[in-house]
Amino acid sequence: PVWKNIFNVCAVKEFSSCADDYPMSVHVLDVGKADCIFITCEGKNILIDAGETSIYKFVNEYLRKMNIKAIDQLILTHQHSDHVGAMSYIVDEFNIKSFMMPQLKDDMIPTFRSYERLLISLDNKGMKAERPEPGKSYDIGPMKIDIFAPLSQYDDMNNNSIVMKVTYKNKSFLFTGDAGKESERDIISAG
C-alpha cells in the first residue's frame, strides 16, 4: 500500500539522519504481514512481537548484527501467530530479562504450536509472563513504557493487545498491537 511506502521512506530518513546523535532507535523490521519492532537506547533493548515462525532466522541475524545479547523487555502484544511465531526462538537464543503478554480468558488460550513452544521456552528458563496493568509504567533504563491496554479481557483476540507508549526524553512512540475499535473506545473512555 501507498501509506507503507510513505512511512518507510519517512522512517528511514528520520532515523538515519538522527541515529548518530540520538541514542534511541526504533527498528520496524520488515517481516511481511506480521509485527516485529526492536527498540534500543543507551544499551537497553526492547523487542515487541516476533512475527511468524518462518522469519526467526531473519530476526535472529538482525539482532546478532547489532551485537544484541540481551533483551531487557520482551513484549508479546497478543497471542496471534503473526506476533508470537518466532518468539520461542528469541527466548531460547537471547538473555531475556523480563517478558510481558496479556492475560486471556481460558477459552481463548491458543493451542497452535508456536505459542505452545513459547510457553515451554519460558518454562525452561524459569520465566513467568508478567501481565500488563493499564496505568502502570515500567522503566527500561532511560526509556519509560506506559501501559494503556488491555483494559479488560475481550472476546476478540486483537482487542486484548497490549497498547503502550515508549518514551525517551521528549520523544514517544505509540504501539497498539492489533487493538480494535472496542479497545480504542475503552482507552478513550478511561482517559
Q: Language-model segments: what does each one mean?
A:
Residues 1-191:
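Non-globular, low-confidence helical/coil segments that flank catalytic cores
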